[in-house]
Amino acid sequence: YKRQLVLHEVGHTLGLNHNFKGSNLLTYEEIKNKETTYEKGLCSSVMEYPSINFSLEPENQGLYYDTIPGPYDHWAIRFAYSQVDEKGLKAILDDSTKPEHAFANDADDMRGTGKGMDPDAMIYDLTSDPVLYAIDRIKLVNEILPELLEKYRKPGAVSYTHLTLPT
C-alpha cells in the first residue's frame, strides 16, 4: 500500500489530477492473473482511488495494489514535460483517444448525489466491469464476515461493531 500511496502523491507533485477512470484498465479475469497485474499494474493511473484487489480464489490472486505508474500516467507526464515542437505535441495528443488514456477527475466522479455524471468515474471500484466486481465484493464480505465475528468478537458481544483488534 505504501508504494501505491507514494506513487499517487508523487503524481500530485508532478501536477497530475485524480483519474477516476484508471480502475477500468483490466477485465475482471485479468485482475486475478498475477503475471498480468505485475506487468500492467491494476489501473491505468496511480491517481485513481482503487479498491484493494482481494480475490475470492487465493490461487488466482493478482497484485493487491498498484506498484507501477500506469499507461495514462506515462502519457500525461510525456504531454506535460516533453519539449517538442507543434508536430511532436500533436503526436502526443493523438494518443489521448486510446482507452488506457481515458480520464475523469473529481468533477466527474459520482461519489455523491448531484455530483458528477459519468458512471465510469467512481472511487473504490476495479475492472472494466464494475458491476461484476461489486457482486464479487458482496460475496467476499459475506464469506469472511462470519469468520471475522468468530475470530475477533469480544466475549458476550453480539455485533460486528464490538470486534477486538488483532494482536
Report residues per predicted region.
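Conserved catalytic/binding loops enriched for acidic/polar residues
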Residues: 23-25, 29-165
